[in-house]
Amino acid sequence: MSNSRPAHARKAEIVAEIVSKIKSAQGVAIAEYKHLTVAKMTELRVQALKQNIDIKVYKDSLVRRAVEELGLVDLIPFLTQQNVFIFSNEDSISAAKLVANFAKKNEALKLKAGIYEGKVVDTAGINEVASLPSKEELYSMFASSLLYPLRKVMAAINAVAETRN
């Protein structure tokens, strides 16, 4: 990438990229990574890549411009320290879930806030989002609930068959 363009033009491009990423993402999580080692950040990036989640580090001042443009000004108080921005493109909870699970094993990563269903959520809110079941878990719960009546019928049939023998 050439640095021949003026700095304000490069910054405007980055702000436009951030706006685009936030608009297209199903969910966004913000985490502080101040004391996270390069190896651990690489591990987080690898896990994110496997789940089709984008991880980016942007200057907070550029993110501030983007969220102001989007009307998400409630996010501004969380834009301090060294932040990593996690964009989930497939569902609204996988970004929060990825960071929350990674943060449990790596205290240097702190989940701070996020955007869920177009609204800014604070630390407690994003942790609550992270605790929601994933799409796969919901499918499993649904399938299990569909099979429950069938299991009861089969158990009743087996009980009747055993009493006749």
UniProtKB/Swiss-Prot annotation:
Give the record's GO CC terms.
ribonucleoprotein complex; ribosome
- Matching Gene3D superfamilies, A to Z? 3.30.70.1730
Assigned keywords, A-Z: Ribonucleoprotein, Ribosomal protein, RNA-binding, rRNA-binding
Query: What are the top taxonomic ranks of the organism?
Result: Bacteria, Bacillati, Mycoplasmatota, Mollicutes, Mycoplasmataceae
Source organism (scientific name): Mycoplasma capricolum subsp. capricolum (strain California kid / ATCC 27343 / NCTC 10154)
Check the record and name the InterPro entries matching this protein.
Ribosomal_uL10, Ribosomal_uL10-like_sf, Ribosomal_uL10_bac, Ribosomal_uL10_bac_type
Q: What one GO molecular function would you report for this record? A: large ribosomal subunit rRNA binding
Q: Could you tell me the Gene Ontology terms of the biological process aspect for this record?
A: translation
* General function of this protein: Forms part of the ribosomal stalk, playing a central role in the interaction of the ribosome with GTP-bound translation factors.
Query: Assembly state and interactors?
Result: Part of the ribosomal stalk of the 50S ribosomal subunit. The N-terminus interacts with L11 and the large rRNA to form the base of the stalk. The C-terminus forms an elongated spine to which L12 dimers bind in a sequential fashion forming a multimeric L10(L12)X complex.
Q: What is this protein called?
A: Large ribosomal subunit protein uL10
Q: CDD domains this protein is in? A: Ribosomal_L10
In terms of Pfam families, this protein maps to: Ribosomal_L10
Which HAMAP family does the record match to this protein? Ribosomal_uL10
Q: Which family does it belong to?
A: Belongs to the universal ribosomal protein uL10 family.
